[in-house]
Amino acid sequence: MSVLCLGEVWLELNAATAPELTETFRAQTGGWGAGFCRQYAALGGQAALLAQLGADPFGRKLAARLAGDGVDCSLLCFTDAFPTPVVFTGADTALSYRAHTAGLALGPEQLEAAPFRGSSAFCFSSAGLVDSPLRLAHLEALAAARDAGALCCYLPRLAQAAPYWPQREALCQTALQFLDRADVLFLEESDLLLLFGSRELRTALFALFTGHVQLIFFYKKDRIFAFTRSVMASAAKKDQSPALVLYRMEKMGIHGIDLPRLREHVLEQLLSNDANTTECQGLPY
């Protein structure tokens, strides 16, 4: 496998109006990790999801859907102790039933080191960092990924995670604590606004390049930037999702040890609008 994602999977019941005003919902597979793995698999990559579902019809249905989309579900856990989480969405409203559910109950003792040794990258986001056993599982997973030499990639997605946190301030403080644990950051303007009070990356670069951080991708409205500690590149924004950029990194054979010596032309390849860029391998640094 090439990419491991840790997070939640929930049954998302979506409506065109506010949940309390609708009688019909469309059932979808929700959760950041599930969505990222599906995107990565659609590109032709191998993506495995580390998550826990309830041993109930909802959990089995979600697992079957993910497997049908090409996601490696061999690492999914199922429990009789907690139900599969459910989230109602509609009209810019998110009503989540996550407390005391299977996803947040996944603890560090349930993780094994072996899957990380076969992975090129470990990816996580902010929704699952809420105070719970799952947050501790993230710390364990980061340590296992680093020991295995896998890239640690953090996609904060704070605006998307905020509805699932009891307090926005706690979300931002927790995100700040996890930023420097990653090798690669995928940031949006809303992340910077919530963390640093500004949408301009130049005001935060010094603070961001600390700890393990060696590479930052910054998504603006119409442009994407890539920074190492020494070089920068940019490209017009089109379809270069984080999943696509990471897929290109995997295809090019970029590992953690390579990040400090990436050159501008490599960053340009990662950000390219040319779909054929995914076929490039072994680019010189």
Ranges and model annotations:
Residues 1-71, 267-285:
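Glycine-rich phosphate/adenosyl-contacting loop at the front of the ribokinase-like
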Residues 21-30, 205, 230-237:
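Short pre-catalytic strand/loop immediately N-terminal to key active-site residues, enriched for Gly-Thr
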Residues 46-126, 278-285:
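Conserved N-terminal subdomain of the carbohydrate kinase-like
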Residues 47, 73, 152-154, 186:
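Hydrophobic beta-strand scaffold residues
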Residues 128, 158-160, 191:
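Active-site-proximal loop/turn and secondary-structure-junction residues that shape catalytic pockets
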Residues 137-148, 173-181:
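Catalytic-core regions built around general acid/base machinery
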Residues 162-230:
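Conserved phosphate/ATP/ADP-binding segment of small-molecule kinases
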Residues 211-215, 228-285:
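Conserved post-catalytic alpha-helical subdomain immediately downstream of the catalytic base
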